[in-house]
């Protein structure tokens, strides 16, 4: 089983190196089962110019089960827990399919930066502020990401 995982991860790694993902840099993959990278905040969002460290931890069940994906610092966002875990359907076992991969996860996260889902909050305060006062929400995000520029 582990051999299948390693082959799959090497294939994904080769694809990322051949066709880099916009706004994403793979920083460390010296352990094929744990990848660390940097995800840039998308343009025209309050997260713009932010550089967010992210970690993918793959299990021997990958790609049958999704990797554990988390940010390595606190990001003020309705769908991100304070410990860096991410609340997005794609990363749940019942929504994951083996046809998905690191690229689809990155694209999903970039979309989440552009269009948070306040109806499924990991951070209730951020969700409520996003719904009630988008200007104040954007200001709080910009204040938070100053540490990550």
Predicted regions and their residues:
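UBC/E2-like fold recognition across ubiquitin and ubiquitin-like conjugation systems
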Residues: 1-149
């Amino acid at each position: 089983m582990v051999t299948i995982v390693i082959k799959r991860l090497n294939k994904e790694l080769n694809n990322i190196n051949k066709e880099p993902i916009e706004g994403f840099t793979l920083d460390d993959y010296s352990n094929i089962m744990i990848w660390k990278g940097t995800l840039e905040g998308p343009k025209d969002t309050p997260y713009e110019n932010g550089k967010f460290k992210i970690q993918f931890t793959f299990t021997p069940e990958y790609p049958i089960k999704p990797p554990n994906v988390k940010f390595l610092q606190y990001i003020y966002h309705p769908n991100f827990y304070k410990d860096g875990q991410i609340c997005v359907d794609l990363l749940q076992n019942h929504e994951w399919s083996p046809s998905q991969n690191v690229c689809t996860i990155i694209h999903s996260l970039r979309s989440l930066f552009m269009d948070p889902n306040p109806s499924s909050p990991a951070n209730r305060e951020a969700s409520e502020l996003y719904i009630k006062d988008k200007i104040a929400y954007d200001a709080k995000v910009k204040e938070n990401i100053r540490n990550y520029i």
